[in-house]
Each structure stands twice: as structure tokens, then as C-alpha cells.
């Protein structure tokens, strides 16, 4: 089968190191009847060993040439190919207990992580290859330089663990950054959760819009509605110093106080 030229517009970097592939599959630990969805299968580096261990795999691939290649390589009863941009796919359609895996396109990694939150109720776990710097932000703690909107939004929904680094030489073509593999498991239904997901997202986005400024200045007219002492947030605090639970409390308090611009559930 002819070689496929990596396409920059799709952020393609094909994993070629078999030892890394084996480490990822071992971390996933797939069982024969698992419901697995792979994003960006590319040249089948993960697809092949996954299909050695499970009965059926669903693959989401935007590149029509690679999608056609996958259909030629594997029978339809083993592999379902969804030819689409992962950012437009409703992952909830694939059922309950999903195990989502993939070497995610680095040019859309953050938007894709936010998009996948919409299907978190259907997901058992997620194992992704990403830029190491993105994973550092995902798992960052308050007060660190990597703590960001991405940290807060994902930590409110998932338990996350950085598993191991992957050198650029493991890919063709090699990316200019170090990569890593992360495990994401949705938090249980009884987790601390905001009264309104939309309000929470709006508050966090506003707070981090000027992360170096004091939060009370960034919040503007919302600051007067904020019960600072009750939330345990110093009025001089910056967004990067506020914990996930405090952000949930802040969003709920502002929503209850009728803060303008916040959507009610």
C-alpha cells in the first residue's frame, strides 16, 4: 500500500515507535467487549493492536484518503469508520461506557477536549497523546504558572493523570514539541458540580481573560455580588490562585445573585 504524505492542515504526526504503541495499549488495557472509539487513527499504529484485543472499534478520521485506506484494511464488522471532523461528531451517539483513545491532532487539541466534555456522561475513560505542555495545563494546581481555564474546566469534570512522555522521534514527521500520554476518567455523578454548566463556563472564561489582574477587577460589576469571605477567596486573589471548588462556588453565588449575563439552567 502506497505511503501517505502527512498533511499539515490536519496536524498529522504519525506514531511509528512500536514500543510507545505497546505502552499506550498496555495503559488502556482493553477487554474484548469494550466499546472503543479512536480519534485520528491515521496509519493504524493504535488501530491494529487494539483490534487484536477487542471485537469492534469505531474510528473517527477526517482525512478521506486515510478513511478509505482503513476501510480497505479492515472488514466493516470489525471497524466502523466515521469520516468526519472530530469537532463535529456527537460522541454520545456511540453509546454508554465509551473508551475514547487517540493521538489527537495537536492543532485542535484544546477545542477537542472541550468538545468531548459534552459526552462525558457516556464515557468510561479517555487515553490521549497530546503536547506535553497541554497536559501540564490540564493537571496543573492553583498557584502554578500552568494553571488556566483549561485546568479548571477539565478538573471539574475529570480525574486526570499524566502517564509518560513521548519523544519527537517516535513520530513521522517528528513534531517540534515533546508529547505525553494522559488518562482521563470522568468524575462520578455525586461530584461537586455547578448549578449551571453554562454559568460556570462563563465565569471561568471571564476570570482567566486577564489572568494577571486581581479577580475583583476582572469580574467588574460581578465583584459587588461576590461573597468573598464565604467562598474563602481573597479580594486580592488572581484567577490562577482560585481552586476548582471555589470557582464552582463563585459561579453558583453569582447565578443566585442574578448577575447579568449568566445563563440559568
From Swiss-Prot:
GO terms for molecular function: 16S rRNA (adenine(1518)-N(6)/adenine(1519)-N(6))-dimethyltransferase activity; RNA binding. SUPFAM superfamilies: S-adenosyl-L-methionine-dependent methyltransferases. Its EC number is 2.1.1.182. It comes from the Bacteria. It is found in: Cytoplasm. GO terms for cellular component: cytosol. It catalyses: adenosine(1518)/adenosine(1519) in 16S rRNA + 4 S-adenosyl-L-methionine = N(6)-dimethyladenosine(1518)/N(6)-dimethyladenosine(1519) in 16S rRNA + 4 S-adenosyl-L-homocysteine + 4 H(+). This is Ribosomal RNA small subunit methyltransferase A. The lineage of its organism: Bacteria, Pseudomonadati, Pseudomonadota, Betaproteobacteria, Burkholderiales.
Amino acid at each position: 500500500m502506497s505511503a501517505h504524505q502527512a498533511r499539515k492542515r490536519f496536524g498529522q504526526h504519525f506514531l511509528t515507535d512500536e514500543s510507545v504503541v505497546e505502552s499506550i495499549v498496555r495503559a488502556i488495557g482493553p477487554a474484548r467487549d469494550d466499546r472503543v472509539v479512536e480519534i485520528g487513527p491515521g496509519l493504524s499504529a493504535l488501530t491494529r493492536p487494539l483490534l487484536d484485543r477487542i471485537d469492534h472499534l469505531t474510528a473517527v478520521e477526517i482525512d478521506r484518503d486515510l478513511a478509505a485506506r482503513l476501510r480497505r484494511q479492515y472488514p466493516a464488522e470489525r471497524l466502523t469508520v466515521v469520516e468526519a471532523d472530530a469537532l463535529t461528531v456527537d460522541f454520545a451517539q456511540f453509546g454508554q461506557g465509551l473508551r475514547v483513545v487517540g493521538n489527537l491532532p495537536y492543532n485542535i487539541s484544546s477545542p477537542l477536549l472541550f468538545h468531548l466534555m459534552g459526552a462525558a456522561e457516556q464515557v468510561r475513560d479517555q487515553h490521549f497523546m497530546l503536547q506535553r505542555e497541554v497536559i501540564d495545563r490540564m493537571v496543573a494546581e492553583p498557584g502554578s504558572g500552568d494553571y488556566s481555564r483549561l485546568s479548571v474546566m477539565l478538573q471539574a469534570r475529570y480525574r486526570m493523570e499524566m502517564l509518560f512522555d513521548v519523544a519527537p522521534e517516535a513520530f513521522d514527521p517528528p513534531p517540534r514539541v515533546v508529547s505525553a500520554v494522559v488518562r482521563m476518567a470522568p468524575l462520578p455523578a455525586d461530584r461537586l458540580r455547578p448549578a449551571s454548566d453554562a454559568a460556570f463556563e462563563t465565569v471561568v472564561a471571564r476570570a482567566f481573560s486577564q489572568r494577571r489582574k486581581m479577580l475583583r477587577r476582572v469580574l467588574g460589576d460581578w465583584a459587588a455580588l461576590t461573597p468573598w469571605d464565604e467562598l474563602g477567596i481573597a479580594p486580592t486573589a488572581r484567577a490562577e490562585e482560585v481552586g476548582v471548588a471555589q470557582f464552582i462556588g463563585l459561579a453558583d453565588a453569582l447565578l443566585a445573585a442574578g448577575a447579568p449575563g449568566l445563563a440559568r439552567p
